[in-house]
Amino acid sequence: MVSLLVNPDALQKIAQKREFSQIKNSLLAKSNIDYQDDIQPWLNNEITLAVTTLDIDRDPDNGLQTGYLMALATKNPVKSREFLELLFSKRAFAGNNLEIERYKGVKVIYDHQEYSASQISNSLAGAIVNNFVLFANHPQVIKAAINNLQAPDLNLVSSLEYQKASQQIPKNSLAVTFFNLPEISKWQKLELAESTYHSQILSLALNSQGLLAESTFLTNSQIVPPSLPLSQPVAALQYIPESTTLAISGANLSNLGNSDLAKLWKQGTATIYGSSEDGISRLIQPLIKIQQNLNLNFSQDIFTWVTGEYALALLTNSENAIPNWVFVVEKTPQLAAGIAHLDNIASSSGFNVISLTLNGQKVSAWTQIITTNQNNQSINLETKVKGVHTTLNNYEIFTSDLNILKEILSQKQRPLLENPKFKNSLGIIPQPNQGYIYLDWETGQNLLQHQIPVLKLMELLDKPLIDNLQSLTFSSYHNQPGILTGGVLLKLN
């Protein structure tokens, strides 16, 4: 179920007026309906679209015939009734056979034909019930909606799951979406793998920085956060450069695999891609490439000993498709053993573990000596740096590039915490929370879309929104029994 809780004209605050007009015109292109003349005079502040049943006739032998219902709030019943009659009269002139039926006191008008799975997608039924204009792809869907209205214990509002989820909806929401996850999986012919979460409610709200999308997942299982909630951004972010394209920060990676976020990730990726491992490789290609380049397994070789604060950043690399990276870890009793383990992996992978001095700072490096041949005559030796790390104050800083470490040590570039786009986002994301994931869309759009294919899909789905996008900031918060809530702030121009 998707509900738009404002008049569509108000959405011009998000999309440019020209772009919004194009969207409205494309939706009505085949109906000979003019939005401004025929719909705008009566349309009020709610439009709801729902998948009400997976199979209208409940006969699996003739395939799934999904039932769709649209409800539009009206502020002028006379005008909306005129619109309904106009719409169906145009369908009659186009050659459709119409039928009018009284059902429980409600006038239902619909295309009269034998409904096959292919015909249902082009069929239409309509009615006016109280202050709503109803449309569906089959009269049975309209009748079921009337039954639900007259028998409140049958409708969605009476569902305990919906009541629990709807309590999390912000009061200023522009739109709300509710998903019954097992039913959604059946509809899309997906197998709901590792089904920890059974329901989801998503809301959209405008604020001074852009658009906040909050999502709440419901489960009957115990919620296990990866760490104690953080009341402020981790101090490790002070060593992450302002020009960062992607930054991930939080605390205690050692418990990440058993956390609520990990279960949600596994459920989503396994359902969509068939396995959580395949989903990870498709969605976070940059991290997978870094892992392969260093012969590491993040969960086994790093996460186990990171029990304090951490911050990971990806930066664009003009010389290589693999982005540069920075990883900052708070000092803990487990740190020394963790570094020794990484040194052993580097040595066993054929890298040299050496020490050097940079800006008066002792630095350890993992290097590889390779040969270069010039003009088939002289052979030169070249040292290739795979990674460097050093201790600074209460943190260990790892990076892929010696020049990046030099900039961090010399403080030539402001930290991410002083980046206005990131800093302003922090005031919108609720606290306490589990940390942040930050994407700078303006500086890293090409890299991110190439390395994270799902972001390319976002642009295809909503180009006007993406064209005005500056950055995205994700976080998880409001952990309550059986509830996981998180949000993403889309900072807009």
What residue ranges belong to the model's regions?
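Generic detector of solvent-exposed, compositionally biased contiguous segments
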Residues: 27-38, 104-115, 188-192, 284-301, ...
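Structural boundary/hinge residues at secondary-structure and domain interfaces
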Residues: 1-65, 72-95, 216-317
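C-terminal/domain-terminus segments
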Residues: 271-272, 327, 457-461
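Short secondary-structure boundary/capping segments
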Residues: 17-20, 149-152, 192, 220, ...
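Residue-level signal for secondary-structure boundary sites
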Residues: 10, 78-80, 142, 185, ...
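Single conserved position on a long alpha-helix in the C-terminal lobe of the eukaryotic protein kinase
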Residues: 40-162, 304-424
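Short C-terminal domain-edge/linker segments immediately following a structured domain
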Residues: 30-37, 101-104, 164-168, 246-247, ...
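Leucine-rich, highly hydrophobic segment in Treponema pallidum outer-membrane-associated proteins
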Residues: 120, 128-129, 136-138, 145, ...
